[in-house]
């Protein structure tokens, strides 16, 4: 097993873990609020559940793309582009860590403070994004493809 497949497999497992976490907190408004959901969203349980389950579906799809890149499930459409895009989304979300750290250091000023949950979420997102990108770039030539692009 190559390093790129291992990286993508880990990224996929972590995406599934995020999906499970998202699904669980979607049914408990106080947990959703604790982990950063807007108060307006939390005040309507039906919308909270729908939004949470839609996010869960997205994270499951992300996980399936990682496993497809590792060769564990069938090839998905636009696999290479999808893996890079998913890695980019996670990494961009993770880069919110920079203003959080700058604010904590007193270099930047924001009206709202950053919670430890937001900091942890940024770190996790950055880690997962880098796993997707590293696995995709390192193993670009060995990624399964119906037609090598």
Question: What kind of region is each of these model predictions?
Answer:
Residues 86-108:
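Hydrophobic alpha-helical transmembrane segments of integral membrane proteins
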Residues 13-18, 82-93:
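Hydrophobic alpha-helical membrane-insertion segments
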Residues 21-54, 69-73, 103-112:
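Interfacial loop at the N-terminal end of multi-pass membrane proteins
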Residues 53-62, 120-135:
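Hydrophobic cores of alpha-helical transmembrane segments in multi-pass inner/ER membrane proteins
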Residues 134-149:
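Cytosolic juxtamembrane helix at the C-terminal end of the final transmembrane segment
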Residues 82-88, 111-128:
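Individual transmembrane alpha-helices with interfacial aromatic-anchor signatures
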Residues 1-18:
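Cytosolic juxtamembrane helix and N-cap/initiation of the first transmembrane helix
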